[in-house]
């Protein structure tokens, strides 16, 4: 079968290589792909935010299954759009994508279902931030609510820094965020666990640790990811 792979990062290159191991796969079309995917698949220059054009290309190249890598098209509802048009697609729908697309949504979900999570406060103005700071201790964790290309989390040592960063977010530093989530700081190592789920079943896909700081030795601001191991 023909596979359509949405995305242009290293993640999509890795997915492309793995998908090609299947005997069921005839060809992979990457939208838009990158230099790595160009060596093992066919890159299609396409704007992945243009859902109508993606649908047109999927039909043009007789693609049997679409796999979506990046968070943004998931959060904006590409799965819902393709599914509505009878295209088979792998990825969470718009509602489920809020787990990644909104930290506030995720924290509320944890609270509702008694899932352990750091203490937090969702803030949309300076006064709410100040109120949180009056009852918390350094270091402080501040997170932009929406997608921020992996750069939306900062660990602050001072209240002044928290106020500065929160105001930048309120003023539109990250276009998808107009709220911040303030959290208590938890000391330890971070890890990600991956599962594929449907309405009745789940399958564990393994775990990994992502290293996001820009500098050697885990220093500097966060990035979308400097490397990971599993």
Where do the PLM segments sit?
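ATP-binding N-terminal substructure of ATP-dependent carboxylate-amine bond-forming enzymes
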Residues: 1-95
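General beta-strand structural signal in soluble alpha/beta enzymes
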Residues: 5, 30-31, 67-68, 89-92, ...
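Short, charged, surface-exposed secondary-structure boundary motifs
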Residues: 38-41, 55, 98-104, 215-217
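Short acidic-hydrophobic, aromatic-tinged amphipathic segments that line or gate anion-handling sites
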Residues: 43-49, 121-125, 156
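Glycine-rich phosphate-binding loop signature in dinucleotide/nucleotide-binding domains
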Residues: 58-63, 135-136, 175-176
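A conserved helix-loop-beta module that forms one wall/lid of the active-site cleft
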Residues: 90-152
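Internal nucleotide-binding/catalytic subdomain
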Residues: 156-230
């Amino acid at each position: 079968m023909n596979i359509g792979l949405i995305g242009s990062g290293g993640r999509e290159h890795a997915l492309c290589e793995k998908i090609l191991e299947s005997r069921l796969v005839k060809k992979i079309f990457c939208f838009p792909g990158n230099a790595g995917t160009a060596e093992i698949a066919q890159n299609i220059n396409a704007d992945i935010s243009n859902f109508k054009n993606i649908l047109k290309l999927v039909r043009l190249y007789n693609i049997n299954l679409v796999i979506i890598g990046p968070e943004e098209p998931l959060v904006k509802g590409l799965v819902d759009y393709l599914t509505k048009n009878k295209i088979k697609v792998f990825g969470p729908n718009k509602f489920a994508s809020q787990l990644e697309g909104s930290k506030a949504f995720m924290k509320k979900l944890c609270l509702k279902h008694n899932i352990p999570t750091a203490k937090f406060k969702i803030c949309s103005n300076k006064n709410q931030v100040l109120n949180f700071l009056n009852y918390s201790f350094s270091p402080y964790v501040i997170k932009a609510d929406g997608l921020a290309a992996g750069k939306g989390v900062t660990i602050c040592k001072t209240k002044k820094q928290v106020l500065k960063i929160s105001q930048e977010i309120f003023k539109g530093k990250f276009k998808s965020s107009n709220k911040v989530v303030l959290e208590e700081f938890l000391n330890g190592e971070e890890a990600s666990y991956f599962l594929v789920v449907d309405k009745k079943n789940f399958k564990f896909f393994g775990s990994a640790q992502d290293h996001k700081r820009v500098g050697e030795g885990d220093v500097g601001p966060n990035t979308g990811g400097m490397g990971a191991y599993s």
